[in-house]
């Protein structure tokens, strides 16, 4: 397990929310943040604080993305026509590691990034080892033949902990997924409320 994967519950504690809906999240047992001072009652956040929190939560959800990478994604969303907040969600959900996670090929977003980085996945028959690779509607994502018997894959597919959203069509017997369409915010099965509009406000200050 990588350091970034082992930090996933730190993100939950920092946010004070079980952002992936995981049964073992420590925030299911307590309502305070990490560290010895976490039990102190938190004061009301300023508008800036609320916006920053929304940004940190969205960054954390997709594997604790680096600020530079997240900002670049936002800038692209802002350049595109339409609602920037919806564009942002669409771009994040189009990431290869996000699709591998949504398809239930692996149990966590962190595991999805590592799985892709280690070369276990193909897109339209071509091996891709970049988690941030952006998929297009109609792309076919498949677990490579030699990787289909990995324990992490078999265990994840067997779990009924989360459903596959309807914008991804999956055949778990063949370990193949099709990215049917780019989703909207309302389509995405977040375990907690995500507020991308606050992220837009944060970067528009």
Swiss-Prot record:
Fetch the Pfam families from UniProt: Ribosomal_S4, S4
Q: Which NCBIfam families match?
A: PRK05327.1, rpsD_bact
List, alphabetically, the PROSITE patterns matched. RIBOSOMAL_S4, S4
Q: Which SUPFAM superfamilies match?
A: Alpha-L RNA-binding motif
Alphabetized CDD domains for the sequence? S4 (cd00165)
Q: How does it assemble?
A: Part of the 30S ribosomal subunit. Contacts protein S5. The interaction surface between S4 and S5 is involved in control of translational fidelity.
Keywords attached to this entry? Ribonucleoprotein, Ribosomal protein, RNA-binding, rRNA-binding
Species assigned in the record: Rhizobium rhizogenes (strain K84 / ATCC BAA-868) (Agrobacterium radiobacter)
State the protein's name: Small ribosomal subunit protein uS4
Q: Which GO terms describe its cellular component?
A: small ribosomal subunit
> In the record, what terms sit under GO molecular function?
rRNA binding; structural constituent of ribosome
- Where is the segment annotated Disordered? 1-46
User: What HAMAP family does UniProt report for this protein, alphabetically?
Assistant: Ribosomal_uS4_B
Q: Enumerate the InterPro entries for this protein.
A: Ribosomal_uS4, Ribosomal_uS4_bac-type, Ribosomal_uS4_CS, Ribosomal_uS4_N, S4_RNA-bd, S4_RNA-bd_sf
Question: Which residues fall in a compositionally biased region of kind Basic and acidic residues?
Answer: 1-16
Q: Does the keyword Amino-acid biosynthesis apply?
A: no
């Amino acid at each position: 397990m990588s350091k970034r994967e082992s930090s996933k519950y730190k993100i939950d504690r920092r946010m004070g929310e079980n952002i992936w809906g995981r049964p073992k999240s420590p925030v299911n047992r307590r309502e305070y943040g990490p560290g010895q001072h976490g039990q102190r009652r938190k004061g009301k956040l300023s508008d800036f604080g609320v916006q920053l929190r929304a940004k940190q939560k969205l960054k954390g959800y997709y594997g604790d993305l680096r600020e530079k990478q997240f900002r670049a994604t936002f800038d692209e969303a802002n350049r595109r026509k339409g609602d920037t907040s919806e564009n942002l969600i669409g771009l994040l959900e189009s990431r290869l590691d996000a699709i591998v996670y949504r398809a239930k090929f692996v149990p966590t977003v962190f595991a999805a990034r590592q799985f892709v980085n280690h070369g276990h996945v193909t897109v339209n028959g071509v091996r891709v080892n970049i988690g941030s690779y952006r998929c297009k509607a109609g792309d076919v994502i498949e677990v490579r033949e030699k990787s289909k018997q990995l324990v992490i894959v078999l265990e994840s597919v067997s779990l009924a902990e989360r459903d596959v959203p309807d914008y991804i069509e999956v055949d778990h017997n063949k370990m193949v997924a099709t990215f049917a369409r780019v989703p909207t915010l309302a389509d995405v099965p977040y375990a907690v409320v995500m507020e991308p509009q606050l992220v837009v406000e944060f970067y528009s200050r």
